[in-house]
Design a protein with these regions (language model features):
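C-terminal motif of bacterial Sec signal peptides marking the signal peptidase cleavage site
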Residues: 10-12
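Glycine/threonine-rich ATP-lid/beta-loop region of ATP-binding domains
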Residues: 14-16
């Protein structure tokens, strides 16, 4: 009986060897499409070591999403008069033995807190569109109409489009596969009119925990 069962399984497996799947079709089946910005779950491009989050404009225009890399680490200076060597751990009774653990030491709060907070990841920077309306005022998120965004998961490209004062704006966002860099194209009559530009912001790191945005 067992030999017959094994033979049957082997025969079944053999028939499936020639089967193929359309990997691109499977991936594109999960293409991400949205018409608004999710403030806690942005669209992203990246390469495994670097990630750039965007809002519905294809950049970080209205929401300060993070730009993160595996090498983006930061440490604040040590408090005055404090050294790392001052921390020796906290002795904890473990089955009758005193074992040092890396826990917060109430007797040495400054160095304990510093070690808990440093080093920490930080936001490399923010890149967004600087846009003005026909009357010269600064564009707000509510001023955009017909917003649409798609993430092509197969190509790793984000396509965003919207209208401002009736003029269409198309933004394409991609990430380099072998370096921490993004490439962006902006197509719109508003560019020639000088009503669309780019701004950069470099937030300073902070030590707040469980924050959506770093810096």
């Amino acid at each position: 009986v067992w030999l017959a069962a094994v033979s049957l399984v082997a025969a079944s497996c053999g028939k499936g060897e020639s089967g193929k799947i359309d990997r691109r079709a499977v991936v594109e089946r999960h293409r991400v499409v949205t018409d608004s910005t999710n403030r806690v779950s942005p669209a992203q491009v990246g390469n495994g070591d670097f990630a750039f989050g965007v809002d519905v404009t294809g950049l970080q225009t209205f929401v300060p999403f993070n730009t993160m890399s595996n090498w983006s680490w930061h440490s604040f200076p040590l408090p005055d008069g404090v050294k790392v060597e001052d921390y020796t751990g906290v002795l904890v009774d473990t089955y009758g033995k005193k074992i040092p653990y890396n826990l917060f030491d109430p007797g040495k709060p400054e160095i304990s807190q510093w070690l808990a907070e440093n080093p920490h990841r930080f936001n490399l920077g923010r890149i967004g569109l600087q846009m003005t309306k026909a009357d010269g005022s600064v564009v707000k998120a509510d001023d955009l109409t017909e917003t649409h965004q798609e993430i092509d998961l197969w190509k790793g490209i984000i396509y965003s489009s919207f209208k401002l004062d009736g003029e269409k704006v198309e933004v394409t966002t991609a990430c380099a596969p072998d370096q921490d860099a993004i490439g962006v194209t902006v197509k719109s009559p508003l560019v020639k009119q000088g009503r669309i530009g780019v701004f950069f912001d470099f937030p300073y790191p902070h030590t707040k925990q469980f924050q959506t945005y770093l810096g």
